Amino acid sequence: MRVTGDYSKDDYVKVEGLVAPEICTALCQQLEMDIRASGRTFQSFALAQPLTRQATVEITGHQSRPLLAFLWGLTPIVSELTGADLLPSFDYFRIYPKGDICRVHSDRPSCEHSVSLTLAYSDGLPWNLQIGTQPVEDAKSLNEDFGDEPFSSVAMKPGDAVLYQGVKRRHGRIEPNPNGWSAHLFLQWVERGGAHMGHAFDAELLRAQAEGERA
């Protein structure tokens, strides 16, 4: 594993080899086997959403035990990388189709510390993640690009990741995906005893959803 950058200064670093490529492949295969066993396909999880131009396959850790176990299992190493005592919040797997983008945005409080992990590219072509250089105080609207704000662009291979503070830094993928598809895992943590600790294990969102169902 190789870390490039200064997390305490820039709120992000590139982590090469966070996960072995073989494990990334095995995770994708396990997800597909589990989905098929339930009588569904990846495409049945495709959703239209504001962040993307096209419908994207999205599966959350609440829907998949392997994804949840992956989040919990990475917690010690991400705590070490950030220098903070972390609790897991939530994670999700996403497949972006060819030509898609991820609009520039900042995240909700449950994404205090975030990891964007590349799992697979259908054509082996890196699809960079862009991160703004200016911290944001409040969530901003979705944008196609960063406007006048300078940003960094980080290329990743399968198994590589970017660790960043999703609440404080705007981020996205503003160039169209050059692959037929690409698979990614996004993992989120909050600090134990911190301002966002109430979001550990995604408790705030799950509580709101439960209250909505009872209403």
How would you name each of these model-derived features?
Residues 105, 170-171, 188:
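Histidine-centered active-site/metal-ligand motif
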Residues 1-82:
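Non-heme Fe(II)/2-oxoglutarate
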Residues 14-16, 163, 188:
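Short, well-ordered beta-strand micro-motif
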